[in-house]
Design a protein with these regions (language model features):
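Phosphate-binding site recognition
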Residues: 1-252
Length: 252
């Protein structure tokens, strides 16, 4: 009997599946999420509870061009109709905010800008897409302003970035996007500790407001975090918004 390696510290679903690590099958989460659909779902779980690996799994399932064999032998593969309808069908924007911190707001904003810029860079093919107009290609290039090796955003461009990227991906693929945001609350926690909480709340409220509330190109979004931040602080006006805690048995 083959003894599988334990994936200590590995949070990438594809790496675990390709490298033959032991994997506790959590793919029922995909089925549960789709069967209990909300436009925006926030999963709150304690630290070290597999949130990032779960989000990596969701990306691998929904993302256009995914290797469907990654799910061979797992629970979700038994639901053929669901896999046929949803697997590999969506552009996916995936950002993790677990590293967004700094002793000042400017430091944290620079880290945040790098994370957003790196994700946008993964879609560099949009700059040459024959589905986009010349103006739309210029808009995309405007999201990738780099000086001295750093992504440079003003606040307005930053807060509009995920919504604009969604629009351009929709134009290219003809399909609405899935947005996954991991550890959404870390920047707020770090900001509170270092005295710039209100500035960070304003920034994230603007980013989420455009990406999750007024985004006509959004199929659905899933967020994870340890804390349930007051809806009035950063989720103001979100419709069809669901918070799923560790106490919700339907997501066991």
């Amino acid at each position: 009997m083959e003894i599988l390696k334990l994936p200590v510290g590995i949070e990438n679903f594809e790496d675990i599946r390709r490298s033959g690590f032991y994997y506790i099958d959590k793919t029922m989460l995909i089925e549960q999420t789709l069967n209990n659909w909300s436009k925006v779902t926030l999963f709150t779980r304690p630290r070290r509870f597999g949130k990032t690996l779960g989000m990596s799994m969701l990306r691998s399932f929904f993302e256009i061009g995914t290797d469907k064999s990654l799910f061979d032998g797992l629970y979700i593969s038994q639901n053929k109709s669901l896999c046929d309808e949803y697997m590999g069908k969506y552009p996916v924007i995936f950002i993790s905010l677990k590293d967004v911190e700094g002793l000042s707001y400017d430091e944290a904003f620079q880290v945040f800008s790098r994370i957003i810029g790196n994700e946008i860079s993964k879609f560099s093919f949009l700059a040459e897409s024959d589905k986009l107009t010349v103006w739309e290609k210029e808009q995309f290039k405007g999201l990738l302003h780099i000086e001295k090796g750093k992504f440079i955003f003003d606040k307005d461009t930053f807060t509009a970035s995920l919504k604009l990227l969604s629009q351009l991906l929709y134009k290219h693929y003809g399909q609405k996007v899935v947005i996954l945001i991991d550890e959404y609350d870390v920047p707020l926690d770090k900001a509170y500790q270092n005295g710039y909480y209100h500035e960070m709340v304003s920034l994230i409220r603007g980013l989420f407001g455009q990406a999750l509330k007024t985004n006509d190109y959004l199929q659905f979004a899933i967020l994870t975090g340890c804390l349930r931040i007051s809806k009035e602080s950063i989720f103001t006006g979100l419709n069809n918004f669901e918070v799923v805690s560790i106490m919700d048995s339907m997501y066991d």
